[in-house]
Amino acid sequence: MSVIAILAMVVGVQAELKQINVIFRHGDRIPDEKNEMYPKDPYLYYDFYPLERGELTNSGKMREYQLGQFLRERYGDFLGDIYTEESVSALSSFYDRTKMSLQLVLAALYPPNKLQQWNEDLNWQPIATKYLRRYEDNIFLPEDCLLFTIELDRVLESPRGKYEFSKYDKLKKKLEEWTGKNITTPWDYYYIYHTLVAEQSYGLTLPSWTNNIFPRGELFDATVFTYNITNSTPLLKKLYGGPLLRIFTKHMLDVVSGTQKKKRKIYLFSGHESNIASVLHALQLYYPHVPEYSSSIIMELHNIEGTHYVKIVYYLGIPSEARELQLPGCEVLCPLYKYLQLIENVIPSNEELICDKRFVDESANNLSIEELDFVKLNLIRIAGTENK
């Protein structure tokens, strides 16, 4: 612990919370048919009515609501009990499950104060949220971006990349027989794993071949390998976890410099487990695991007698408990200047944030002619523009 932090404890000076940034994973969901379902999946044609593929289950809805309750309990004194538009920013990816997860977190985080109660029978109030369309999203889904794809392909085609991937050849052969799916990239292991997670969470009985490889075992190892290889170079870290870190950091610096446009207290980002893993990788805090449903990285900005500190909290989701993480080379309560030094090499530049997904078939199909006409050649998401 730093000298200032120790002295603060000795003389009884309290750290003053100034801002909170949160990136969290959506809740439990139904398997997503586009990438995850495999030909021999016994639930390939299962009727999940009234749910559609990829949507939140009731368990997932409750888990996100509980995340909101956790945030309310931990930060209630700081946030206050009255919602104001300028106090919170809420952004999600374009998936329905992340949009709904964001609404559920907000419902628990900001139940209506008596002053704001508009229906005595409903302990809820509407709160504005925003989302990024897939073709403009290099925050939650940067793996679609051309520069990321080029760099990852370079890594996978390198001698080292081929060697690391070949370590799972025995698993590959067995999985192809069991699933009927051709395994050609690390993502294939990843998608099979997450299909099994979703089906198990829903209460479905998994095939017997999963017993020795899931949730721990070779398939888990191959999925962890996917997280590792997709964050294995400085550029991949910049492009994957870097955009969120850049946004978090700009938000904090705006507070410190007094240039914050609105008096934001909390920024909520509703995304995916890949966002949790990539931010942990960028911070050199990742350990072999698959981030659980509703897991969250929380970055707190504190002030102790004029000196600013950063604290990182990992809400595990399952179980619903939190851990304070210590950045390598710093303390749990890390001086802001030291934090800035530690993350300097994983913050992307404007040029590295350039991401045009118009030529990705899936994204292009979702655009109207008018939208295609107006999309700029280079889409640069400048961190912190939602403050304006």
UniProtKB/Swiss-Prot annotation:
Keywords: Allergen, Disulfide bond, Glycoprotein, Hydrolase, Secreted, Signal. One of its GO terms (cellular component) is extracellular region. GO terms for molecular function: acid phosphatase activity. PANTHER family: ACID PHOSPHATASE-RELATED (PTHR11567), PROSTATIC ACID PHOSPHATASE (PTHR11567:SF211). Residues 1-15 form the signal peptide. Gene3D superfamilies: Phosphoglycerate mutase-like (3.40.50.1240). It comes from the Eukaryota. It comes from Apis mellifera (Honeybee). Its EC number is 3.1.3.2. Disulfide bonds join C145-C355, C330-C334. The keyword Membrane does not apply. The active site is at H26, E273. It holds the Pfam family His_Phos_2. It catalyses: a phosphate monoester + H2O = an alcohol + phosphate. Glycans are attached at N182, N228, N366. InterPro entries: Acid_Pase_AS, His_Pase_clade-2, His_PPase_superfam, Histidine_acid_phosphatase. This is Venom acid phosphatase Acph-1. It is found in: Secreted. Expressed by the venom gland. Belongs to the histidine acid phosphatase family.
